[in-house]
Amino acid sequence: MSPVFPMLTVLTMFYYMCLRRRARTATRGEIMNSHRTVESNSRTSPLNAEVVQYAKEVVDFSSHYGSENSMSYTMWNLAGVPNVFPSSGDFTQTAVFRTYGTWWDQCPSAPVPFKRTPANFQSQDYVELAFEQQVYPTAVHVLETYHPGAVIRILACSANPYSPGPPAEVRWETLWSEKPTKVNASQARQFKPCIKQINFPTNLIRLEINSSLLDYYTELDAVVLHGMKDKPMLSLKTSLIDMNDLDEDDYEEKDDCEIDNLNKKFSSTALREGPSNGYFDKLPYELIQLILNHLTLPDLCRLAQTCKLLNQHCCDPLQYIHLNLQPYWAKLNDTSLEFLQARCTLVQWLNLSWTGNRGFISVAGFSRFLKVCGSELVRLELSCSHFLNETCLEIISEMCPNLQDLNLSSCDKLPPQAFSHIAKLCGLKRLVLYRTKVEQTALLSILNFCSDLQHLSLGSCVMIEDYDVTASMIGAKCKKLRTLDLWRCKNITESGIAELASGCPLLEELDLGWCPTLQSSTGCFARLARQLPNLQKLFLTANRSVCDTDIEELASNCTRLRQLDILGTRMVSPASLRKLLESCKDLSLLDVSFCSQIDNRAVLELSASFPKVFIKKSFTQ
């Protein structure tokens, strides 16, 4: 055979994998909606009546707007029958996630995105709901009461959260997914996507959210699961599937690219013998590495099977310096980490967010991985990784001496004593403890030893007893601090704010939303404005006492301001806002929702005068 043919074969396969996504035009939602074999072709006997049920319990979630000790705007509102629907508007009885739009991605605290994230993974938040009865799902309805369109993926799990013993197997299956789309709907809606039929019963449903295209916070009221107790029989009618319908998402599911199959591919040594590598060995090693940098993890796994030369390149640790495993949370397990271990000896950025839950990753498996791969780690993302315990944090503190960035957001099952180990990571520059059970003693120790901190998130940390003491320590020790999240801290006063403002002059971002003990009459907000001239983002959400004096101080001293949230104040007038907008030329987001002096007419006038500023004013119908 001519030597040209092996080269053509490998090049064709490589070209196909690299450029395939550009050749697809259909969305995944269109594909699933075009597979009509399931949509209307199941039949049931009278004995197999459809079960319709609301969620019994909220099992897990990644974030919410509300407090840990309240029901207002929390994910727990998704349990049970609707509270608001069919009304629309901003209601406290709904479930609301912490962010919307791209505003948080534009802040100084926003982390750099991971490269090589698959284009089909765009989920930002999730919530998992348990239902009373296991059924074979026929429909999932989501009641959206404000700014709909955030749900982009619905999954079902084989595990029964109410089963007394651990499940023999845990499987997640995607029922429906779609790319983020802009929904122009001003009224509440019942979102009823056409779902795929699965071959196991479920009472655990997961919604994944992307709010990047929303104009304001999405609000969800309830979720309804329709299904059959017995497995429905498909009719003989089948559908013909156009090959053009197979987009990348579908291709990855049908072509054995799930992470469990990738494990086998990575460990395979049964590669073809001989020099048939398509003459890739004629290219410089560095050039091949540069080309492979554009491939996702599944693509690397596929390419590794073509020949020994490309297998060597695909297994080179240089390909895994930045490793994002979050998109594969549904399949990633101890075996996955074991197979990746030899390739991750140089890993510097590692994202394990959302992974390992329900026994997928063990403490032993995580520890083995870090003992081999932790020495070069600079950044470690572990948001919502509920397998973590104190041993895991101890291992991190011992095996990751170069760690600068640690995210434990919503790891709410970590015991309070576990956080003391973080104090050993003296080089930390970013620490996210949002919705964790960190206590004051451990936090003060962390602040004492981690004096290089630049970004600190303590939002919704309800176990911290005295935020004034915490703020004083931050001001004394963290002189390099640039961003601080104190969202819903329960007891900080003007004393803590004074220590903070005088000790952290470099602050560019400060979130004091829903901090009820701060009063403008003490001068705390005016002091912030005078002492923090570099502020770009300031959230004073739901502080009723913010007044014109505070706004005028911001206008005079914080001309770099980009985002300001003063939702809920009664004391701010349109005149002071106009001064602010005239002084702060970079201002792009201004939330004046429920500000009693700022009516719709004032918003329209200010928007007309300052068209580059997004002025938000929420409403309740």
UniProtKB/Swiss-Prot annotation:
Domain called F-box: residue spans: 277-332
SMART domains linked to this entry: FBOX, LRR_CC
Subcellular location: Cytoplasm; Nucleus; Mitochondrion outer membrane
Signal peptide segment: none
Keywords, sorted A to Z: Cytoplasm, Leucine-rich repeat, Membrane, Methylation, Mitochondrion, Mitochondrion outer membrane, Nucleus, Repeat, Ubl conjugation pathway
Modified residues (Asymmetric dimethylarginine): R28
GO cellular component: cytoplasm; mitochondrial intermembrane space; mitochondrial outer membrane; nucleus
Any one Pfam family match given in the protein's UniProt record, by short name: F-box-like
SUPFAM superfamilies to which the protein is assigned, alphabetical: F-box domain, RNI-like
Oligomer and partners: Part of a SCF (SKP1-CUL1-F-box) protein ligase complex. Interacts with FAF2 and VCP. Interacts with PPTC7; this interaction promotes destruction of BNIP3 and NIX and mitophagy suppression.
Primary role: Substrate-recognition component of the mitochondria-localized SCF-FBXL4 ubiquitin E3 ligase complex that plays a role in the restriction of mitophagy by controlling the degradation of BNIP3 and NIX mitophagy receptors. Also rescues mitochondrial injury through reverting hyperactivation of DRP1-mediated mitochondrial fission.
Protein name in the entry: F-box/LRR-repeat protein 4
Species for this entry: Bos taurus
Lineage: Eukaryota, Metazoa, Chordata, Craniata, Vertebrata
Gene (UniProt): FBXL4
